[in-house]
């Protein structure tokens, strides 16, 4: 049993800095300003479920999917970096106020007409939480841990779903507490957080691209 707890602890130490639920909370605050409490809670739960599903698929089928479509981890990093940087630029340099933008109006109408429409999958679950770095780490870990001898076989079988569940629960708790943060910071604070998050996302996206390019150079040099 101690081996299981040790494996879960190691997994959380590796994944939490990459997933960074607090970053997702700040992004959520910038995107959910027009949502009521019930809708924010629903988005929080759905984002957590999506994160769990993405991590499970990445661990058990990620390498197969990437091999099937000929996708390399450097390619995954560069594509994810472009997406993150694009989202960051849109948040950092909004052409108009967020609540007056066509995207916001379209999303509001979509949420009214179609309850299943949401921001939980993109960008909260992917790429903010289960982004290219997280997915790449999970896929690379899956290809090595199954051949490792540090833990018993049953621990290697049981630990990954529990680690992903723990990350999802932490994300859900963080997003649920964002309501209190919204009451404290107000609309102006949300705008400031949104712009700050935009800058951070641009930096993250550029770094993902740099890492991908460096891996390509290292591979083919």
Swiss-Prot record:
What is a single cellular component term in the Gene Ontology annotation? plasma membrane
Q: Which residues lie on this side of the membrane: Cytoplasmic?
A: 29-44, 90-118, 172-196
Record Pfam families: MarC
| Compartment(s) of residence | Cell inner membrane
Q: Which domain of life is it from?
A: Bacteria
Database matches in InterPro entries = Multi_antbiot-R_MarC
| Keyword match Transmembrane | yes
| UniProt KW Cell membrane keyword | yes
Tell me where it mainly resides.
membrane
Record topological domains on the Periplasmic side? 1-7, 66-68, 140-150, 218-221
Q: How does it sit in the membrane?
A: Multi-pass membrane protein
List the transmembrane segments.
8-28, 45-65, 69-89, 119-139, 151-171, 197-217
Q: Which UniProt keywords apply?
A: Cell inner membrane, Cell membrane, Membrane, Transmembrane, Transmembrane helix
As for family, the record states: Belongs to the UPF0056 (MarC) family.
Identification of the protein by name: UPF0056 inner membrane protein MarC
| Native source organism of the sequence | Citrobacter koseri (strain ATCC BAA-895 / CDC 4225-83 / SGSC4696)
